[in-house]
Amino acid sequence: MKKIKLPSKVTVGAFEVELICIPHDISYEVSESQGAFVGNPPYKIYLDENIINHGGKDAVNVVVHEMLHVGYYQYSLKDKDEEAVVNAYGNFITELLSRSELKDWIKDNI
C-alpha cells in the first residue's frame, strides 16, 4: 500500500505553515530538537527528516507537537487561563484532524 506523503504546507484557519524536513544532524546541532516552529511570517516548521521518513506514531507526535505551537501562537494563549487553553486546543486539533492537509497523513501513520 502506498504511504501518504507529508504535505509541504498546512492551512489551519488563517495560518499557512510550510513543513520543511531537514537532516537529522542539523536538527540536533541547531536546536537540539526533533522539530521547530518559526512564529514569524512566513510560518514554517522544521522537522527531523529521519523521524518523518520512518513514519508511524513518532512522526505524528512530532508533527502534532509542532502544530500545537502554531495553535498556541495563533490563539495568543500565553496569558490565558486553563479553560481558554483547553477550548482553543480542542478547536485547533479538530480543525487539524478534519480539514487540514495533514488529516490523511496523520490517519495513515497512526
Positions of the model-derived regions?
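Long, well-structured alpha-helical subdomains associated
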Residues: D104-I110
